[in-house]
Amino acid sequence: MRDGFTADTEKVTPNIPNSVKVSNGDILFSWSASLEVMLWAFGDGGLNQHIFKVTSANDFPKSFYYFQLLNYVDVFKKMAEARKTTMGHITQDHLQQSTIAIPDDVSIAKSFEEKVSPIFDLQVKLQEEIQQLTKQRDSLLPLLMNGQASLNYDLSND
């Protein structure tokens, strides 16, 4: 999930239901094998059967359920380990049995969101920049290596 789009990534048609579309800034939870939580920052995509897009039915801020789930993932890992399967995963029952603390005053969570939201936005922006730089490197490096391009840079001044 953290690799984003690779050469092995299966492409998906844009004509998929909105319920399985993911966009930058979405919170994703991998419930099989890796059991991870992440802030998606790899562009538009589609979910597969092993990844959930996490949202709040009660209008809690994204940062609240992101960090709650991030803290709870160790509990899920213990549940998966207890099943003694070759590839750890959790079931729908595990999700339904799970509980998290919810503040009586949602304004606490919303105040936290005001502070954390810009950090989430920056994470997405930086990941987008990393992807652009990676593409540039991957296209320029072969040209440099085989002599089709050169740098006009004097290393002796460093």
Regions found by a protein language model. Give the residues of each.
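Amphipathic alpha-helical coiled-coil/heptad-repeat segments
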Residues: D59-F60, F67, N71-V75, E81-K84, ...
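A generic structural signal for residues embedded in beta-strands
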Residues: F29-S30
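Short, compositionally biased
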Residues: L39-K53
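Short, conserved catalytic or interaction motifs in soluble domains
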Residues: S56
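Short, charged beta-turn/beta-strand-edge "cap" motif at the junction between a beta-strand
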Residues: A33-V37
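Short beta-strand/turn micro-motifs at beta-sheet edges
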Residues: L39-A41, K84-H89
